[in-house]
Each structure stands twice: as C-alpha cells, then as structure tokens.
Curated annotation (Swiss-Prot):
Function according to Swiss-Prot or TrEMBL: Catalyzes the attachment of tryptophan to tRNA(Trp).
Origin species: Helicobacter pylori (strain ATCC 700392 / 26695) (Campylobacter pylori)
PROSITE patterns per record: AA_TRNA_LIGASE_I
Source species taxonomy: Bacteria, Pseudomonadati, Campylobacterota, Epsilonproteobacteria, Campylobacterales
GO BP terms, alphabetized: tryptophanyl-tRNA aminoacylation
Location(s), subcellular: Cytoplasm
Short motif 'KMSKS' region, span: 195-199
Binding positions for ATP per the UniProt entry: Q11, P12, T13, G19, N20, G147, E148, D149, V186, K195, M196, S197, K198, S199
Catalysed conversion reaction: tRNA(Trp) + L-tryptophan + ATP = L-tryptophyl-tRNA(Trp) + AMP + diphosphate + H(+)
Binding site for L-tryptophan: D135
Residue numbers covered by motif 'HIGH' region: 12-20
Name of the protein this chain belongs to: Tryptophan--tRNA ligase
Length: 326
C-alpha cells in the first residue's frame, strides 16, 4: 500500500528544547512506520534574521545529530539540509509571482517578528512563507505537521497550490495539515503563558535536550506554579497544568493516575519526581548523541539530499514548463 508523504521542516537557530521534542520531534519519530517522511533542516529560513555564519553551519549539523539521537532513522526517512537542494529558492521565485501583496501583508508572524526586531526587518522575513510553500510543494507532500503558529502559512501554501493548478494546469498536490492532539504546546517553565521557545532570554525558561541532570533539577525547582498547592489538571492554573502535561507526555500515564499519585503531596514532591522522569527520558537521547560522529552526520545528509533532489527537480521542471519558462 502506498504511504502518504509527510514533509517536516525545522530551523537550526538554537538548542532543541523539550517543547520541540514533545510538540514535534517525538511525533515525527513515532510516525516513521506509518508515512513516507522527509525531514528538512530549513537553514535558508534561518538567514531571515541576523545570524553568525559559523554558528549557522555548526548548528545545522548539531540539529541533525540531535534528530538522529531522538530516533529519526535515515533508513526509513529522508533527512537533508534545505540549501543542498537548489530547487527550493528556484520554485519560491515562481510562486512569488503568483501571490498578491495583500495576502502577504495578512501574515501575522511577519508582524510579530518585525515588531520584535524592527531594525532587522528584510524582504526575506516578509517573504519567507513563500519559501515555506516551496519547501512543501516541491515534494508533492500529502501532509504537513503544523502547530497553531504555522496554520496560516499552510493555508497560504494550499491557496498557492490551488491557484497555480487552476491558472497553469495541474502541478502541485494540495497538502493537508497533520496536527498532533497532545503535546502541541509546551509552555515556558518561568512563564506558562508563553510557548517554550529557543529565543526566550530567561535562564530557567526551557529544558534543553542536552541539559545535565543538575541543571534540570534546578530549572524544575524554579518552575512557576501557584499558591493553591493542589496537584490537578486545571487549564486555568497554567503553571501546574503545564508541568503536569509534561509529566504525562514523558511518563505516558493518564491524568487520573497522576492526580491520584500526588493527591496528598505538595509541589516540592511533584517537582522532584518530574525532574527524575525528565532526566530518565532524556538520558538515552544524550547517550546516543555522544555516539554519533560528524562523518556519520555528513554521510546521512549526503544520502538524504540525493533522495530529495530528483523529487524536487521533477516538480520544479513541471512548474517551469507550465509557466512557459525555457
């Protein structure tokens, strides 16, 4: 039976944290048997904001090493770097010419990012949803895992595909969203009102996958809760709800079992056990990470790019011909 193709992209712009893992990467690992997967390190997206070239290069390899340590299997899935497939920006230019300024000006992420970095706003930042559409459409993707913050961009991608097919002839598969029901939003430890983020400045905001046990214990001790002292899954109590959600995702226990276990215990006891569950969950990832060599990473990326290029080339050539380009 033909497996549906899934395209997933991740930027190499900072350390991978628990929110990335529980919200995306863990699901990617679990769906490798069910789908044909292409995992792409979207490094061209990373240059829409100021970034040191040496850091970008090292972070790209670092990210691949972590993805492998988390369980991405290059024998099952394609894993490659965006900039190694030339058709990504080439198709993006063709798509640029099919999208109105009005559609682009409605993109909320551009507004948010430009407010945070007003001195660094460039055309690439404004335009990157088109490159994202190119990433997806190049591979005739059936499904795209998206969080809440990327839904608008996938909708734009779908609109672009439908418009192109209507105006020039059938070329692109119109992708559907693949939204994880659980774990899609892990919030910051220091501020449970905001999503856990690589770019947040707080020292105790995020748990990173390579954090040492003593660092994890320290961060969890300082994690925000409330003054009620009752351990229960209540979405209105953002701090304890976030910690319980993390515990549930790492332990695979039901909310009922967790509440029963901590019924007569305080936040200190719960945080101590949460830190231990976290340490044990991250231990095998950290051990595998240490075993992966730079040469192994480069060989896997070469193989992934070799798999991706023919797919991308076929789509780009068809789009080019349909538009009358020689």
């Amino acid at each position: 039976m033909h497996k549906k193709r899934v395209f997933s992209g991740i930027q190499p712009t900072g350390q991978i944290h628990l929110g990335n893992y529980l919200g995306a990467i863990k699901h990617w690992v679990e769906m490798q048997d069910e789908y044909e997967n292409l995992f792409c390190v979207v490094n061209s997206h990373a240059i829409t904001l100021p970034i040191d070239p040496a850091f970008l290069k090292s972070q790209s390899y670092e990210l691949v090493k972590l993805l492998l340590a988390c369980g991405i299997d290059p024998k099952q899935s394609g894993l490659f770097i965006q900039s190694e497939v030339d058709e990504h920006p080439a198709l993006a230019w063709l798509l640029n010419c099919q999208v109105s300024m009005g559609e682009m000006q409605r993109m909320t992420q551009f507004k948010d990012k430009s407010l945070k970095n007003p001195k660094s706003v460039n055309v690439g930042l404004f335009n990157y949803p088109i490159l994202m559409a190119s990433d997806i459409l190049l591979y005739q993707s059936d499904l795209v895992p998206v969080g809440e913050d990327q839904k608008q961009h996938l909708e734009l991608t779908r609109n672009i595909a439908e418009k192109f097919n209507r105006d020039f002839g059938n070329c692109f598969k119109v992708p559907e969203p693949l939204i994880a029901k659980v774990g899609a939003r892990v919030m910051g430890l220091d501020d449970p009102k905001v999503k856990m983020s690589k770019s947040h400045q707080g020292a105790n905001h995020a748990i990173f996958l390579l954090d040492e046990p003593d660092i994890i214990v320290k961060k969890i001790k300082k994690a925000a809760t409330d003054s009620m002292g009752v351990i229960a899954f209540d979405e209105k109590r953002e701090g304890i709800f976030n910690l319980l959600n993390i515990y549930m995702l790492l332990s695979n226990e039901s909310p009922e079992n967790i509440e029963e276990r901590f019924k007569n215990k305080g936040y200190g006891d719960f945080k101590k056990e949460l830190a231990e569950v976290m340490i044990q969950a991250l231990k095998p990832i950290q051990e595998r990470y240490k075993e992966i060599s730079d040469d192994e990473v480069k060989a896997i990326l070469n193989g992934g790019a070799e798999k991706a290029r023919p797919l991308a080339r076929a789509t780009y050539q068809k789009a080019k011909e349909l538009m009358g380009l020689i």
